[in-house]
Every structure is written in C-alpha cells, then in structure tokens.
Amino acid sequence: GKKVPRAAISLEILGRIERRYRLSAGYFLSLSGTPDRAPGDFDLNDISPSERRRLAWHLPEDFNRRPSQEKAEILNWVRTVIISGSTDYRRYQAAAIRQRYAVRFSCASGPVRKSSPARTPEESGIVIAPKRLNDEMADLLRFKTSTFAAFGMQRNGVWGTETASQKVEHFGLWFGAFVAPPESEVQGLGVDPKLLTFAMMIFPQVWDWYLHWRERRRGFYTKWEIDLLSIAAAICREETGWLRQSPRMGSSLRPIEGLVSEADINAVQSDWPAACDRMYKHARRRIKEIDRVARVHRDPFEPILPVLEAPSPVGEYRKITEEILQRMPDERHNARAAAEAVRAFLMLRIGLHTGLRQKNLRELLLCRPGALPTSERKLEDLKRGELRWSSRDQGWEILIPSVAFKNANSSFFGSKPFRLILPDLGRLYELIEAWIERHRARLIGEAADPGTFFVKTAKMTSTNAAYCQNTFYEAWRTAIQRYGIYNPWTKRGAIEGLLPHGPHSVRDVLATHILKRTGSYEQASYAIQDTPDMVAQHYGRFLPQDKSEIAARILNQVWEAA
C-alpha cells in the first residue's frame, strides 16, 4: 500500500509483531521512513481539535495505554514547556493575548490577526479607528516616513517600514486601553471612540492614567513604558515635534469624564506651545522615575539558557539541525513533511551561518543556478538580499545591501553590502539544492511564487506562500518545539531544558559563542552585523566565569609548555 500507518493502535500492533518475531524495535517504520505526522487517534476527546493537533506531535505512542494520572502529567508538561514555554513572561503573554483590546487603523498596511468568524471586531475587543483618528495616524506616518518633511515642518529622524508598522500597533494598543470597558478583563476607561484624538497626548494626566493602568496589568514597570514616554516627548519637542507643529489638532479635543475637563482643553488651546513644553518636561521626568524602578520581564536569554551555558553554544544549537536530519521523513512516502523538515533545517542552518535578523532572512530572494543575479542597485531599491550561486567562488552566496538592514547606518557596514559565501558543510549544499529543485515547489503548490528563498506551506485556507513577521516566527518556533526541546516522554528532541523561541535568539547564540572563545566584543559584533556596544548591551551573555576561563586558558599555556 501507499499509506503509512500512523494511528496509535496501528503502531502498537506493529510493535507487537516486532516483539513476536524478534525484530528490532521500529523495524516496520524504518522500511516506510519516518512518519510524516503525529498519531491521529490519541484519547483526547475533551480537548479541542486545534489543540489536539498541537499536542499530538509531542505525545508518546503508548499514550492511550498509560494510567490517567500519568496522561494528565504528560499533557501538563507538554502544554507548559513545549506549547507555551514555562517562563514568567510567556505565562503573562498567554493571558494577555486572551484579553484583546486595540484600535485598528486602516491607514497602515501590515499583517492583521483574524478575529473569530463568530465574532465581530468589536466583540473581540478590537475597535475600528474613527475617520478623524485614522486621518491623524496617516498624517503622523507621512510626517515620519516621507522622503522630505512637508513644507514648513521640521523633524528629527525618520521611521523605516518595520518601525512604522510597530508604532501603528503600539498606538493602537494605547488608544485601545482608553476605549476598553471598565467592567471587562482589560479594565479600561470606557471612552467613546469618537472622542479619541492624538491631541489627548498633550495632557500629563492622560499619560499618568495610562502608566498606572500598565502597572496594574503587569505588576511593575518595564522599558516598554519608557519607550512610549520617549514618543510622547518627541512629538511635543520644540521645533521638531509633530504634535507641537500641529496646533490645529487642539480643536479636536473634547472633555473626557474623570480625565480631561473643559477648563483643561481651554488652557491647552489658548497656549499650545506652553502645553507642549509642559508635556515634554513631564515625559522626561517620568522617564527618569520609571527607569529607576523598571524591571526586565522578558529575559531573551532564558529560553536558550542551556545553549548559552554550553562550552560551545553554536555546537549545542547545531544539535537541533542534526536532530532534523536524523528524523527527516522519507520523501517518497511523505513529500510535504520532508519539504517542511528541509525548510526547518535550512532556516536554522542559514541563521547560524549568517546571524541575520528574521526580516532579512524571510525576505531573502532566490536566484536559481544559471539565472542572472539581481543587480545590487535593484536589491537596494527592494531593500532585500538574495541567495545566488557564485561561479567565481563556486559556492552559494548571500548578498544583502546595507540599506536592507535595521542598522543600515551602523559603522559595521560603512555603506557597503553584506556578502557571505555559505560553507559546504554538514549537507548544507545538498539540501539547498534539493530545496530549490523539489521541496520548495511542493510547498508553494498552486499559489503564486513570492520569489523568496523561504516559503510557507500554501493551503486551501491560505494561498499566499510568502512569510510575514508572525508566520516566520511561528515556523522557527515550531521547528524548536518539534526538534529542539528534549521530551522525556518520547525521548525525542536535541537539548534538555530548551524552551520555545524565535529566530532572533540565534544572534544571542552566535555572539555568546564568539565571546566565550575570544573575549572580544568586536569579533562578536562581526557575527551579527552590529557594533561592540550593541553586543555588550543586548546580545552577548558573557559572565565573569567566562572571562576568567579565557584568562586561565592563556596563562595555563605557560605551565603546559614547561
């Protein structure tokens, strides 16, 4: 037959036959290749189908035969460690996601999470921005993203596409807090959406209400509040502040019960520059006060701590790619599963070799062997890189113009492009070629080819094969869940103690690896296309014992020579 057994009962019967005829464990499955999916008949009737599919990947084949208490223990472990990640921040985030609140702007493009089909945006906590508020958001985006500031306006710095998209989301959450009903889980202020305007941001008491609301939700302050206050200060700054240069917006202000009175509005409208100065000083003062007590909620090192603590962080992380190769489905029987495994392997391997941010990875274009590579000028216009075959170096080359990077003005680039020849090691070239020739097309199917090297699996419900920020993150995270995290119940997974994480973590791995080997922040910065200061502040986990070990290694050479 063409179908491979995948039901738990089928696998159990095969195991009995193997024991009866003294065959090696897994003999029959080895003939048909690695199963392409998890068993489909686990006893999980009280769990929703979507969660059942996620859990099934991580349950042992004999799950149905285990005692009820042990089943509950397994399910709890899988949910806590693999599905959600057991960090304090992940638990907070999981709870916060269920409490949806935001104002959605139609003037900005970007990925939008789907609401439940049975719920309207309003029922799901999402409020569509009224026309006036939407127009104000569009005006701010023009001010911060256009090539030139409008005549008569001054500005300090511009936003790139990614930054603009992020700011739109942050403003949506800011206004969403005021709109959310007080009796809801969000415990907002219940303001009528028609009263919302960016001019609200000129009032110190409005910001103080929001800051106290943030503290109630999280329990403490973080750098998030400092970043928001920095925006408040920037838009009110003398000469270059967008709000400061838009006094006409004062006419949009209306009283908000318990927050903004008619007298407050009259005072602001009568002297707009003075009101902006007052808000600017208030924001700077609050930034200093919060900076003193701010705590770190999301520790970026926590999910990958077992990797960073290893003597060779890159060698430890590489185990995940070896696990993928070891469990690679047989392409003859499970073509799509094999293609997805190859994609996961290439994501991690290319990430480890380049240290690229996920935007640069997911937008990497593909030039097939024999085709004419895209010119550097066109790549600059597209702000994307390309993977192409280099005839000169006889290897796969990644070329990315400096303007495509988040830190394009960094001294690392000096206005020159990033160029790297990938090494022909560990089956990398073999699987790149297999991906281009066969696997990539299988995942695209009937969908339009986006032209990128990495593509997602196009399905009936999602015919777009191009990755966005969220789907690329989920693809990486899924690879870590399936192949990276050691599961004591199934004995699968590469690294014990690892937790789910996204592509950005690979930059921490590379920087820490080089720091442990060389002690040089300068050399560590080369691996992730950044500066030594950025490595020291954000990426490298370089502990005192690591520094002492490097010094001891050098000093011990004297005694070894003697």
Locate the predicted segments by residue.
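Conserved tyrosine-mediated DNA breakage-rejoining catalytic core shared by Y-recombinases
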Residues: 259, 313-332, 364-430
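Charge-rich, intrinsically disordered N-terminal extensions
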Residues: 6-309, 522, 546-549
